Each structure stands twice: as structure tokens, then as C-alpha cells.
Amino acid sequence: MSEKQEAILPVVPLVPGNEPTGRPLVELTHVEKYFGDLHVLKDINLTVNKGEVLVVVGPSGSGKSTMCRTINRLETIESGDIRIDGKALPQEGRQLAQLRAEVGMVFQSFNLFANKTILENVTLAPIKVRHMDKKEAEHLAMDLLTRVGVDSQASKMPSQLSGGQQQRVAI
């Protein structure tokens, strides 16, 4: 077996019961992106199946964050196709807003409000953006914090958590 084959490991679901299905959820086909004359994304082809966890690794300036930002249209592409669950990525409007509300990404720089507890940080968007009842938002937040293994930290301030724990809260 070659070194490359030995390095391939099975995907372990982040959430039990969310095993990869083989059904494409995110598809990038021949995606191209420029910043002026700088060709940042060159013929990117990627398929992420439902239930898979993807880690994008590469040197600084190689286009990792730019590629991720194109998936929810925080960056536009010059050419190619991006599909979410088989549907073309919306250009703008309500459908795009709905997609952004459903797709979570954490970039190198993420922010938690330093003056709010972990629970308050996680409930802020559902309460303010979706007008969710506070109790319902707290119940949902605790479920999400449990899923990423930081539910016991809910009453702490961000500065009391490790960098990895803070990133999981941001997710």
C-alpha cells in the first residue's frame, strides 16, 4: 500500500447518527476566482457528501478561506458552478439569506462577545435574527453545545475557555 493510501482514514461522524451518505451536499465544479490579476482559485472541483466532515489544509495564501467564502457567496466567483444539495447557489435575496442561516463555517478569525457567557453568545443570533423565544433559544443552544462537547462551559466567559473550545462554540 502506498503512503498516500495509508493516510486515508474513514470519516468519523461529528454527530452520532450523521454518517456520510454518499449523497453530494456541497459541490464545486470548475470554480475560478481572481482578485485583480491574482488567480486565487484555479479549476476547483470538490464534492462533500452529506454527513462528511471536511478540513481544508494548506499554506498561507493558498485560497482556503476564499474557497470556503465562495460556498456561501461571501465571495463571488468568475466561473464555475457551486451547488448545495443539488441546487445552484442563489445569487442574492431570501434564498441566499436562508442558505447563510443554515450553513455554518468558522474561519481563522472568529469572534465571541467577551462580555457575554458562552450560552449568551450562542443564543444571541436565534433571539435577535430569528426572533426565537429566549427559553427555546437556550434549549437549542444547550443541545448544540452538547453536540460539540462544551455544554459544561455554558456559564463561563470566552476567556475562560481554550482556543479550541472557543472555536467549537463559534461553530
Residue ranges and their predicted role:
Residues 1-9:
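N-terminal acidic, proline/glycine-rich, low-complexity intrinsically disordered segments
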Residues 10-171:
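ABC family nucleotide-binding domain
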